[in-house]
A protein has these predicted regions:
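Preference for long, amphipathic alpha-helical scaffolds in soluble/luminal domains
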Residues: 1-194
């Protein structure tokens, strides 16, 4: 048996040993702080934050901030602009004041890394939804393009994988409608220079 075959066998054994008797795996989903910041955003938008443990989200976001004011995509990357903006947004939506040291340091990092205009599209999308970024700064594909015959359409959703279609089609509609749900904190955050 080759070294590769033995390595594959060992990896399979480790994975199968962790499988539950019902056939699935149960483990912690590890990610960066964007999942938490986005959950805060959704709960604030839907008004479901009142009966949720938002204090845990606040603690989690604060505890994962780096000394340079940023939040990382992965451990040791030195800080990621988009993730730092989303964490900042999450903290503001949770009521953290703009003059608190964690946000002052975050703002310094964000500005030194280029600010919102250099962030990823999804970060800008989250900010646009709460009125803190202009929808005109986001690229969009009009949803009606899906109605064009394939022969003349520059784009067909069937060129995308099934999982990509599942998120692209709804996003095309949202980008077309350009909704803005301003929360009080969202309005206050919009006046900040980040």
């Amino acid at each position: 048996m080759s070294l590769l075959d033995r390595a594959i066998e060992k990896a399979q054994a480790v994975l199968l040993a962790q499988q539950t008797p019902n056939g699935y795996w149960w483990a912690t989903l590890e990610s960066n702080v964007t999942m938490t910041a986005e959950a805060v955003l959704l709960h604030k938008l839907y008004g479901t934050d009142v009966d949720r443990p938002m204090g845990k989200a606040l603690t989690y976001l604060r505890n994962h901030q780096c000394k340079n004011g940023s939040w990382e995509l992965y451990k040791g990357d030195g800080g990621n602009l988009s993730i730092s903006i989303e964490a900042y947004m999450g903290l503001r939506l949770l009521g953290v004041a703009i003059d608190e040291p964690c946000l002052v340091n975050a703002r310094e990092f964000i500005l030194s890394a280029g600010g919102i205009t250099k962030a990823r599209i999804f970060t800008k999308f989250h900010l646009a939804v709460i009125g803190c970024y202009d929808w005109r700064g986001l690229p969009s594909i009009p949803p009606w393009i899906m109605l064009l015959p394939n022969q003349i359409s520059p784009f067909t959703i069937y060129e995308l994988s099934s999982w990509a279609r599942g998120s692209t089609v709804p996003l095309m509609v949202v980008f077309d409608r350009k909704p803005v749900w301003l929360t009080e904190i969202g309005r206050a955050s919009c006046r900040e220079r980040v």
